[in-house]
Swiss-Prot record:
Known function: Required for efficient ribosome biogenesis. May control cell cycle progression by regulating translation of mRNAs that contain a terminal oligo pyrimidine (TOP) motif in their 5' UTRs, such as GTPBP4.
Matches recorded under InterPro entries: DDX52/Rok1_DEADc, DEAD/DEAH_box_helicase_dom, DEAD_box_RNA_helicase, Helicase_ATP-bd, Helicase_C-like, P-loop_NTPase, RNA_helicase_DEAD_Q_motif
Modified residues (N6-acetyllysine): K15
Protein's UniProt name: Probable ATP-dependent RNA helicase DDX52
């Protein structure tokens, strides 16, 4: 129903007095309707029933008077039809309004939901990033705990689990990585897992790991990676070791893994030759130097210095606890001079050893910049792959009997025998040479050529038993040593750890037998603790011995026990042999003088 129909219904039966209100009627044009078109056309155009049939006839006044009922019916049907149309319009309008409102509400709801979803995504991303970080930390902690890696410091670099990570994270030279894998190093050892990333981040390092755990490779790989390529700047890396044998071993390992990279790695053999080769007038076509402290100090003290260390970026001290020792057997003064000679602002230092020395640790904390401390397993502990045994022999003569008993029972060579002095090494050699076994001795009084030949023969298996002093126990890797005999009791637990560390290397099994007498009682407790920590049996009565004070320990290290002679030859024969030796040397010296005079 439209507006006109509504007013028509309301005004049904009401009449407007046109006579009385003629002016208003004329103004609003109230009167009879005038149609511009014929009513028949309208009626013919109407189709109430949807059958497209026109209504015949014309609806006039006469017809309405004649058939009022039909007209009323048509009018009612027309009004009903209009009502239905108006209802449909209302429904469509309300449906459109409802749909618009619904669309608006849906749009509003969707925007709200989108905002809620964004917040949820942000929360989830925060949660996932936090979870990922926690998972990463858990993996790192699991790896460190699994391999007994103990780290102290700030901003600790993550350890590596494989050598391939060096390519993924640090872009290692492909040739260097291939050399490492070709050398048989498929997986990094615990010390390599943590020490390599620390040095690659340029952090100064104090590292301690059991003997035979791959410390040489732990500092060699990051040095070669950080130097990147050869450069004519002089030595950029310096590696110090206490013995020439150990320096030679490090030099050999560096050459092996750097093959094809072009690095020039040198070792000082003769100081005079080195002064010409590495002096101020040299071309500086060298990169890495491996040496002992004394030879380097000799070059530094020359005027002008026979070597320039101003370009050194990495200073590595292997067996640092030995080099930091004071006194005749230590190298503390020499090491201080070397540190001062490395004047570059880029220089970083790394200390490696099988044992943690308190002096070294304190010095590193005071002098190294933001140092990181890395240790594998329990500090100052023996290798777990070594079967350790304490054997009471009563007296000095009992030691020689025990060695001969081992020879009779049979042993699996190669064997290392440690004594406390050069004189005792000579005496034991003369006693065992008649036992029918291939035995040799190595000590500081032998020439360098003799020492090199002895080490080479021992590695080749030509020598079954090698007698040596404690200094040789530092770092040298004799592959396949099955037995270590501590003929003379070590002066400290640290020395004991280094001695027995010559066997059981790289995960292989080994055995260590330590002789002790009544005189060794004060030193027993500290060594017994090391043996017990490694899971080996120790007699109960030894555990009850009193501990030595630190002052007493230092005295015993500086002044070892005076022991009886090993030699079983009567003194009279020994004195005659000495006199004969003096006469021979005197005659030889006279002949030399005579030859010089003639010339």
């Amino acid at each position: 129903m439209d507006v006109h129909d509504l007013f028509r219904r309301l005004g049904a039966g009401a009449k407007f007095d046109t006579r009385r209100f003629s002016a208003d009627a004329a103004r609003f044009q109230i009167g009879k309707r005038k149609y511009d078109f014929d009513s028949s056309e309208v009626l013919q155009g109407l189709d109430f029933f949807g059958n497209k049939k026109s209504v015949p006839g014309v609806c006039g006044a006469s017809q309405t008077h004649q058939k009022p009922q039909n007209g009323e019916k048509k009018e009612e049907s027309l009004t009903e039809r209009k009502r239905e149309q108006s209802k449909k319009k209302r429904k469509t309008m309300t449906s459109e309004i409802a749909s618009q409102e619904e669309g608006a509400t849906i749009q509003w709801m969707s925007s709200v939901e989108a905002k809620i979803e964004d917040k949820k995504v942000q929360r989830e991303s925060k949660l996932t990033s936090g979870k990922l970080e926690n998972l990463r930390k858990e993996k790192i902690n699991f790896l460190r705990n699994k391999h007994k890696i103990h780290v102290q410091g700030t901003d600790l670099p993550d350890p590596i689990a494989t050598f391939q990570q060096l390519d993924q994270e640090y872009k290692i030279n492909s040739r260097l990585l291939q050399n490492i894998l070709d050398a048989g190093f498929q997986m990094p050892t615990p010390i390599q897992m943590q020490a390599i990333p620390v040095m690659l981040h340029g952090r100064e390092l104090l590292a301690s790991a059991p003997t035979g755990s791959g410390k040489t490779l732990a500092f060699s790989i990051p040095i070669l990676m950080q130097l990147k390529q050869p450069a004519n700047k002089g030595f950029r890396a310096l590696i110090i070791s206490p013995t020439r044998e150990l320096a030679s071993q490090i030099h050999r390992e560096l050459i092996k893994i750097s093959e094809g990279t072009g690095f020039r790695i040198h070792m000082i053999h003769k100081a005079a030759v080195a002064a010409k080769k590495f002096g101020p007038k040299s071309s500086k076509k060298f990169d890495i130097l491996v040496t002992t402290p004394n030879r380097l100090i000799y070059l530094l003290k020359q005027d002008p210095p026979g070597i320039d260390l101003a370009s050194v970026e990495w200073l590595v001290v292997d067996e640092s606890d030995k080099l930091f020792e004071d006194g005749k057997t230590g190298f503390r003064d020499q090491l201080a001079s070397i540190f001062l000679a490395c004047t570059s602002h880029k220089v970083r230092r790394a200390m490696f050893s099988a044992t943690f020395a308190y002096d070294v640790e304190q010095w590193c904390k005071l002098n190294l910049d933001n140092v990181i401390s890395v240790s594998i397993g329990a500090r100052n502990s023996a290798v777990e792959t070594v079967e350790q045994e304490l054997l009471f022999v009563g007296s000095e003569t009992g030691k020689l009997l025990a060695v001969r008993e081992l020879v009779k029972k049979g042993f699996n060579p190669p064997v290392l025998v440690f004594v406390q002095s050069i004189e005792r090494a000579k005496e034991l050699f003369h006693e065992l040479i008649y036992e029918g076994i291939n035995v040799d001795v190595i000590h500081a009084e032998r020439t360098q050529q003799q020492r090199d030949n002895t080490v080479h023969s021992f590695r080749a298996g030509k020598i079954w038993v090698l007698i040596c002093t404690a200094l040789l126990a530092r770092g040298i890797d004799f592959k396949g040593v099955n037995l270590v005999i501590n003929y003379d009791f070590p002066t400290s637990s640290v020395e004991y750890i280094h001695r027995i560390g010559r066997t059981g290397r790289a995960g292989n099994k080994g055995k260590a037998i330590t002789f002790f007498t009544e005189d060794d009682k004060p030193l027993l407790r500290s060594v017994a603790n090391v043996i017990q920590q490694a899971g080996c049996p120790v007699p109960e009565y030894i555990k009850g011995f009193q501990k030595l004070l630190s002052k007493q320990k230092k005295k015993m290290i500086k002044k070892p026990l005076e022991r009886e002679s090993i030699s079983t030859t009567p003194k009279c024969f020994l004195e005659k042999a000495k006199d004969k030796q003096k006469k021979v040397t005197g005659q030889n010296s006279k002949k030399k003088v005579a030859l010089e005079d003639k010339s």
